Amino acid sequence: MSEMAEPQVVKKIVLKNFRRFRDATVEFGPGLNIMVGDNEAGKSTVLEAINLALTSRWQGKFFSGELTPHFITLEATREYLEAIQAGGRPEPPELVVELYLAESANTVKLKGSNNSLGEDACGLRIVARFDKESFGEEYKSFVEKKEEVRAVPTEFYRVDWHDFGAHAVNPRAIKVTSSLIDASRIRLQSGADYYLQRIITESLEPKKRAQLSRAFRSLQESFADDESIKALNSALDASQEQITDKKFTMAINASQSNQWDSALAPHLDALPLHMAGSGEQNKLKILLALARRVEDAHLILVEEPENHLSFSSLNQLIERISGKCEERQVVITTHSSYVINKLGLDKLTLLSLDPPMR
């Protein structure tokens, strides 16, 4: 790492009635952050919630269209249903995601005290709540049939996205960006193709590209002169009367979609990428995604990079991620306690069924 102060974008996130978190605050330090926890501890939820607060999107889609009862924590849902069955008319539970940001030129316009902690801070807030004005009558009819109430009626909710100054957020005005990298959702070939094309574009002058095109064309022409191709075309020509009156032959596709750069395939130690081991493929997916996105993001979020990796490979990968993102804040989730032995405890956040500890 450089001697410069480590970058920080996100200071903490507050989650209320969101997925498995009834009321939780997760804090982050500058530079590299590692969230360690077992499966179902909520690591993925925290990363998705950070991205949600910055974009108002859940897995790429607007949250207002993705909201379902399953986003409301089970404890809040159970209390709500018990109150309904007891004959009450409680308002449905409110869902809150608050992202507290470090103050900078990019975030100062998001400053205010419109947050659950009452802090004068920079940040963004997603709130999903019952829309009484629009659905008051419908909700009244809904709770009257208490025997039919089995879930929180999120169809009667509205989703608001505000900054801590209580202003509605214009997505184009958000100057802080994140990149969420989950190897399980990335196609290895598309990442490799993008990386290759970028290297080709940046490295080859027009003359060199023309020479490669000519060399590839020569290979195509020599293939057409092969005796096996000639034999195939002779057989086709002999049977052409069955399908056409014209001479029927096969030749290499010479269209723009079959040029030399599209015929290249990346290899590792002479082995095609898709033949590499699962751990190596996951590592490549993450590093290729970083190469593509790191320049455009202030915050890098990486989901469980350790799949199919040995402990030593995981440590090497984390070091490479950190090295590639020296000027970015990074949050990595993992269920591997091995990293505790390799990193300072100040880099770790432990997630469990209890409140998270840093």
Mark where each language-model region is:
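Switch/communication elements of ASCE P-loop NTPase nucleotide-binding domains
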Residues: 1-55, 260-358
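Extended helical coiled-coil dimerization/tether regions that scaffold
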Residues: 2, 200-281, 288-299, 323
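A general secondary-structure signal for short beta-strands and their flanking turns/coil
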Residues: 8, 21, 90-96, 119-123, ...
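Solvent-exposed residues in well-ordered beta-strands and their adjoining turns
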Residues: 16, 29, 100-104, 129-131, ...
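Conserved P-loop NTP-binding catalytic core
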Residues: 49-118
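Non-catalytic alpha-helical coupling and interface elements of nucleotide-dependent molecular machines
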Residues: 51-59, 131, 164, 201, ...
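Conserved catalytic network of the ASCE P-loop NTPase/AAA+ motor domain
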Residues: 87-92, 116-119, 152, 290-295, ...
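Electropositive, glycine-dotted interaction segments
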Residues: 94-96, 102-230, 234
